[in-house]
C-alpha cells in the first residue's frame, strides 16, 4: 500500500515522503497512529500544494534576509564605554549590548545569538561583527566603540 508520511518514522520514511509499505503495517500502525495517510489523489495534491507553500515561504525568508543584509552592511553601531590607558575598556561590550543599541538607534531587531562574536569587545575602535541572518546569508555589522 502506498502511504504519505505525516511524521518521521525511523527506518521507514521522513515527513512528506511517499512510500510503498505492507498493507498490515500501513493500516494497523502507520495510519492508526497518525504517522501516515493513504496515498490517493486528494492526499497527493494536498502534499504538492503544501510543498509549494513551504518553498514559497523559504524563498520569501531568503529574500527578506538578503534585503536586511544590504541594509546592515551600510550601518555603523555607535557604542560608548568608559576606558582606561591605551584604549582598554573597563568591562566589555557584549553581543547583547550591540543588539540593544541596533534596535534602539536603527529599529532593527536581531537576536543576540545570531551575532558571531567569539569574545566580548574590550578595546576602543571599529570592530566587524558577523551576523547570521539566514543559513545562506551572513551580514557584517560595523561596531564603533568610542570613549564615554
UniProtKB/Swiss-Prot annotation:
Domain of life: Bacteria
A Pfam match: Ribosomal_L9_C
Disulfide bonds: none
InterPro entries: Ribosomal_bL9, Ribosomal_bL9/RNase_H1_N, Ribosomal_bL9_bac/chp, Ribosomal_bL9_C, Ribosomal_bL9_C_sf, Ribosomal_bL9_N, Ribosomal_bL9_N_sf
GO CC annotations, alphabetized: ribonucleoprotein complex; ribosome
GO terms classed as biological process: translation
SUPFAM superfamilies for the chain: L9 N-domain-like, Ribosomal protein L9 C-domain
Keywords: Ribonucleoprotein, Ribosomal protein, RNA-binding, rRNA-binding
GO MF terms, alphabetically ordered: rRNA binding; structural constituent of ribosome
PROSITE patterns in alphabetical order: RIBOSOMAL_L9 (PS00651)
Family: Belongs to the bacterial ribosomal protein bL9 family.
Role description: Binds to the 23S rRNA.
Protein name as it appears in the record: Large ribosomal subunit protein bL9
Organism: Listeria monocytogenes serotype 4b (strain CLIP80459)
Name of the gene this protein is made from: rplI
